[in-house]
């Protein structure tokens, strides 16, 4: 008997019909002789609707109350799926994140999981119940308040619960048949991938691939939890995320795919003194604003000798906060101005094969040049090349790179609904 954790996203439980379909799949898994734990997201656009409501009643909703509000979405879908399972003759019991033992930091809106104490879940499993856990939420270790986990929180909940229960696999159900060499909405002949290493999936998630979120993959790699990405709408085998690139023979390594990200912004600090310590002041200020930095470029400044310009990218949602923090410290740090651009996009090529295939960077840049796309900034790792370009050219760039590296398959990928989550 295997212990299977399944996670269903908002599009998979968007209405009553889809909830019943999900319940049937869950019961089938139970009847196959497995213990089953299910993590669900809020139905469809429920979270966005709740956010809109909050902003209608308050220009600045208190973070604690916002978390109390938003967690209602997952509790609703959790209970509805449990009801649907019971109607099929199986036994189900639903738990909120706090009831399931998901212990977090106290940062409302973006809490991190500290621990999972799954005693109540184990008891329910021992009684033969199908266990349901509301995703995206937990309880603060210090204040005991309800917290939310931020973007990708339900995926992270599923992997954390799987690790705590020592599950055999964590199945993440989306609206595509696994992981592809590119977004099928942009590249219809994107090729399905049977397996992907944790490192490759981390790079893909960090570069904008929306099927799995970065925090979820980080957690899975840390606790060696295999992730099985499948579609809620088909019985196709999906993609297994497991193992390390070190386990892949060098000659067998391939290029995994092309990822893109429309959600970044570019910040440029102009006229910074070109002496030791000033770059550190810039990045310390950004860190104090709780903004994560992605790509970084430093150039000789054109405005004055002895000065430098530093450009970095961050999440678009956090860009204004970084600019505000830096602007407040302009005189103290000693730069001329801050420039902000949120009309950018990032496109990346990922794959363990880069380690053994010379010329990848040249082909990458040539493909973009032939498509008439100008590169603003380049960043690389052992298994990734990323460039910053205009956001209006992202789709063209993805298609050009996918074709240049021969990543396409013979069949057209199917997207069943929603946004790939």
From Swiss-Prot:
Instruction: Give residues annotated as binding substrate.
Output: 25-30, 45-49, 74, 125-126, 151-154, 274-279, 292-294, 298, 360-361, 374-375, 381-382
> Cytoplasm as a keyword?
no
Q: Which residues bear the site annotation Contribution to the catalysis?
A: 7, 74
Stretches that traverse the bilayer: none
Its catalytic activity? L-aspartate + ATP = 4-phospho-L-aspartate + ADP
In UniProt terms, what function does this protein have?
Catalyzes the phosphorylation of the beta-carboxyl group of aspartic acid with ATP to yield 4-phospho-L-aspartate, which is involved in the branched biosynthetic pathway leading to the biosynthesis of amino acids lysine, threonine, isoleucine and methionine.
- The identity of this protein, by name, is Aspartokinase
